[in-house]
Structure formats: C-alpha cells, structure tokens
Design a protein with these regions (language model features):
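Flexible C-terminal active-site loop/helix
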Residues: 1-13, 18-30, 36, 275-331
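Metal- or metallocofactor-binding catalytic centers and their adjacent structured scaffolds
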Residues: 5-7, 21, 33-102
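Short, charged beta->alpha transition segments
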Residues: 95, 104-109, 128-134, 147
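N-terminal/domain-start segments enriched in small and hydrophobic, helix-friendly residues
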Residues: 95-99, 107, 112, 117, ...
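N-terminal small/glycine-rich loop or linker at the start of catalytic domains
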Residues: 102-127, 156-165
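Catalytic domains of carbohydrate-active enzymes, especially glycoside hydrolases
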Residues: 136-145
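Catalytic core of soluble alpha/beta enzymes
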Residues: 146, 151-283, 287-289, 304-316
C-alpha cells in the first residue's frame, strides 16, 4: 500500500466574495492511496474560518495511519484528531479505493440509488449591475443561491428576483445581528425566496435562530456555520428548519451520513453543501445527494481550471459517471 499527498491551486472564473471574505485562488490537498495498482483519491478543502490551511492539512495526511484499507471506520478512528478537512480526504479516498476494487460506484457501495442532483449555482457578492447581468446569463439554471452581507445586497437580490425566474436561495454567512436578521428574513419572505441560510453568527445561539425561524416561516432557515458535525444537531433541533451538511466540515462521507441521519431523527430538513472544490470533492458529496432536500454542490462549476474530470454539469444538473469509485480522474 502506498499513499501520497499534494497541494494543488485552483482558480475561480470570477472573484468569489461572501460576507466575510473574497478570493479567486484556493489551495486544495489531494490524498491518494494505492493498493495492488488501484488508486483511491480524496480532496481536502481547508478554510481559515475553521483554522485550517493547506500546509497543516497536508502535514497531517503525510502522517496518516491507514491500516487495513477496507476498514474505513478503523482508519477514521485512528486519525480522529486530524483537521476535519484532512479526515475528509482520507475518508473519501478510502471509499473511492474500496468501490474501485469492487468495481462499483461509491453510491452502490453505500447501498444507495443512483443520484441525479440538481444543484444551486452561487452568485457571490458583487455590485447590483454585475450580479443581475450574471443572473441573466444563468437563466437555464433552476436554482440560484445569492450571497448577501448587508442591506445593499438585499436590494441587489430584489433586482435579481425581478430579472430571473430561477428559484432563489439566500446565504448571509452570519452577516446580520439577531435584531437585523428579523427584518432581513421578513423582507426575504416577502420576495418569495426558497431558503435562507445562516443569517446570524454561530455564537448567537438557538434562541436567536428560533425567533428567525418563526419570522421566516414557511421559508426554511438552514444552519451552516452553526452545524459542523452530528453533535451540533440536537442543540439546533427545534430552533432551525434544517442543517447544511458539508463533507469538508464534518469529516467525509461517513460523518456526513451520520449528520444526515441525526437531523432526520429530529425531523429536520437537510442541505448538502460544499466549499469551492474540484470535481473530486464534489463527486464525493454527490454520491449521497439523494438523501437530502437541498443540494448546493456547485464548487467545481465555479472553477476556471478544474484538475479532475468525471461528473458532467448541465445547468445545475450533476450527472455522475458510470465508472467505479467516485468516477473521477485527473485531466
């Protein structure tokens, strides 16, 4: 058995801005594990918001203890102190390897039906004219997710609503105070948006979320930054409509499944999200997309230089390849 680790830089076609940051270059860490000529790959998408960077994640993966390559749970337990994005790369690579050795897609390995998710396409924060023009170019997309960071962006969203027939989701990335957020979600409800994601800081607590959820009803309010792992779900139950599960946050496919099932046990909606990732990371998440209510797996669609091929993206529809594993290969 051999393992390898490398850092790759990828670039978005447009500067990607959210409420707290903007960037057009992202470092991703690729972990590979090879057994008997078969290679499994996984991607880590570290972010400074969770105190992770590519160098630290790569160093953790260099020291990984895999053990039996079939024993995914054992490997995750042995390496549980790694940064979550590093654990994601390990988890996804081991699923890819196991499924390739068996000659089946990962979703079959997991006992799931073939998913055909329709993903939102995210519009980062920009001036009104730019955002509206970009939304018009994306008319074929069924769902647009619009990032907002202040009241000016709410007015931009209103202009998008007037120029686009797509379903609109809104992501504030913790931008508003609990008091402001009540006004914001009331305004958004009046615009007919389909979902509102993380209007307030994760530190605001369940009571603030409950007030927002009541004000927004029947529009669902989804927790993202407040919902990192399955352990966060019980505290949020009854306060939000649902949680955003991201493999890079929680630690990969197996931990994502745990989070999804926990949310379902509490009667919550589930969103499946991503970071800006290559098709390697997106394909891993897409394997379990049939289990959720909202799909936001557009990370690779935003890239100008995706180093992997496999999934096809057609106006938000993600078509997974028929091949084994994650179905992804280097370009």
């Amino acid at each position: 058995m051999e393992t390898s680790v490398k850092i790759v830089k990828v670039h978005t076609e447009r500067t990607f801005a959210i409420a707290r940051s903007s960037a057009d270059t992202f470092e991703r860490v690729i972990f590979e594990i090879s057994v008997d000529g078969v290679t499994g790959r996984g991607e880590a998408a570290p972010t400074s918001h969770y105190d992770q960077d590519a160098e630290g994640v790569a160093a953790a993966l260099e020291d990984v203890e895999v053990g039996d390559p079939w024993d995914i749970e054992g490997a995750l337990a042995r390496n549980s102190t790694m940064p979550p994005s590093a654990l994601t790369a390990l988890d996804n690579a081991m699923h890819d390897l196991a499924a390739r050795r068996l000659g089946v897609p990962v979703y079959r390995l997991l006992g799931l039906a073939r998913p055909e998710p329709v993903s939102a396409y995210t519009l980062g924060i920009a001036d009104r004219e730019t955002t509206v023009a970009y939304a018009k170019k994306l008319q074929a997309h069924r769902i647009l997710k619009v990032k907002v960071g202040g009241w000016d962006d709410i007015e931009t969203l209103r202009a998008v609503r007037e120029s686009s027939e797509a379903d609109l989701w809104v992501d504030a990335n913790e931008a508003f105070s609990p008091e402001e957020a009540i006004e914001v979600v009331t305004e958004l409800k009046g615009m007919g948006v389909g979902m509102i994601e993380q209007p307030v800081s994760a530190s605001a607590g369940p009571e603030s979320f409950q007030n927002l959820t009541e004000a927004a009803f029947p529009v669902p309010v989804i927790a993202d930054e407040s919902a990192i792992t399955a352990g966060d779900v019980p505290e949020l139950a009854g306060s939000v409509s649902g949680v955003n599960v991201k493999l890079a946050k929680c630690g990969g496919i197996r931990r994502a499944l745990e989070m999804i099932h926990t949310a379902r046990a509490y009667g919550m909606l589930v969103m499946l999200g991503c970071m800006v990732e290559t098709s390697l990371g997106i394909s891993a998440a897409a394997q379990i997309s049939g289990l959720v209510d909202f799909v936001d797996l557009d990370g690779a669609m935003l890239l100008a230089d995706d180093p992997y091929s496999g999934p096809l993206y057609e106006n938000g529809l993600i078509l997974l390849p028929d091949g084994p594993g994650l179905g992804v290969k280097p370009r």
